[in-house]
Curated annotation (Swiss-Prot):
It comes from the Bacteria. The keyword Membrane does not apply. One of the primary rRNA binding proteins, it binds directly to 16S rRNA where it nucleates assembly of the body of the 30S subunit. One of its GO terms (molecular function) is rRNA binding. The gene is rpsD. Gene3D superfamilies: Ribosomal Protein S4 Delta 41, Chain A, domain 1, RNA-binding S4 domain. This is Small ribosomal subunit protein uS4. Keywords: Ribonucleoprotein, Ribosomal protein, RNA-binding, rRNA-binding. The keyword RNA-binding applies. NCBIfam families: PRK05327.1 (NF003717), rpsD_bact (TIGR01017). Signal peptide: none annotated. Belongs to the universal ribosomal protein uS4 family.
C-alpha cells in the first residue's frame, strides 16, 4: 500500500479533527472546514454504524502518526501480545517511533517532515545515525541532529515554531545543541484525550 501523497487538509476533514499534518502552532480550523467531509457531498450528514465509528477512529490514529495499514496492524498485534492494556500499549508503540520522537522534540514541523529527516540520515540516536523512521526509541535514548544537517533551514524553522508551544513532559530538548533526551515512556494521561483507542481494540478484536 502506497503512502498517501495528496492534500493533507483533506485527511483532517475526512476524520473531522486536526491531525496536525500541517506545520504551524495554530490549529487549522480557521482555514479548513473540519466539520464537513471532503468531496461534493461532504456537507451531508451520515450516521455511521458501530463498525464505521471504529474504522474512522482507527484511520484517524493511523493517519495522525503517518503509519501504513500493514504497519498499524502489526503494531496492534504487538500491543495485544504485551502485558497490560492493549489500547494504551498501541499508543505507546506509536509514540516510540523515531519519526514521532523527532517531531515531539520539535526538530520536524510535522511527522512527515520528521520522517524525511530520519530517512535522509539527519538524525542520530545515542551518537549513531539511524535512518529507519519506525526505529523504536527507548527511555533515556539521546536524539540529536547530525552535525552536517544542523544548518538546514527547515530544522531551524521547526525549532522556532516548536519553541512557541509546550513540549511533552517525557522529552527534554536543548534547542541550542539540537539534541534531546527521551526521558520516559508517555503515560496515557500524557496523550490526546480525543483518541479513543478502545474503539480500535474493538475493531481488531472482531
Amino acid at each position: 500500500m502506497a503512502r498517501y501523497l495528496g492534500p493533507k487538509l483533506k485527511l483532517s476533514r475526512r476524520e473531522g479533527t486536526d491531525l496536525f499534518l500541517k506545520s504551524g502552532v495554530r490549529a487549522i480550523d480557521s482555514k479548513c472546514k473540519l466539520e464537513t467531509a471532503p468531496g461534493q457531498h461532504g456537507a451531508r450528514k451520515t450516521r455511521l454504524s458501530e463498525y464505521g465509528v471504529q474504522l474512522r477512529e482507527k484511520q484517524k490514529v493511523r493517519r495522525t502518526y503517518g503509519v501504513l495499514e500493514k504497519q498499524f496492524r502489526n503494531y496492534y498485534k504487538d500491543a495485544a501480545r504485551t502485558k497490560g492494556n492493549t489500547g494504551e500499549n498501541l499508543l505507546t508503540l506509536l509514540e516510540t517511533r523515531l519519526d514521532n520522537v523527532v517531531y515531539r522534540m520539535g526538530f520536524g514541523a510535522t511527522r512527515a517532515e520528521a520522517r524525511q529527516l530520519v530517512s535522509h540520515k539527519s538524525i542520530m540516536v545515542n551518537g549513531s545515525v539511524v535512518n529507519i523512521p519506525s526505529f523504536k526509541v527507548s527511555a533515556n535514548d539521546v536524539i540529536s541532529i547530525r552535525e552536517k544537517s544542523k544548518k538546514q533551514a527547515r530544522i531551524i524553522a521547526a525549532l522556532e515554531v516548536s519553541s512557541q508551544r509546550e513540549k511533552p513532559t517525557w522529552v527534554e530538548v536543548d534547542n541550542t545543541k539540537m539534541e534531546g533526551a527521551f526521558k520516559r515512556l508517555p503515560e496515557r494521561s500524557d496523550l490526546s484525550a480525543e483518541i479513543n483507542e478502545q474503539l480500535i481494540v474493538e475493531l481488531y478484536s472482531k
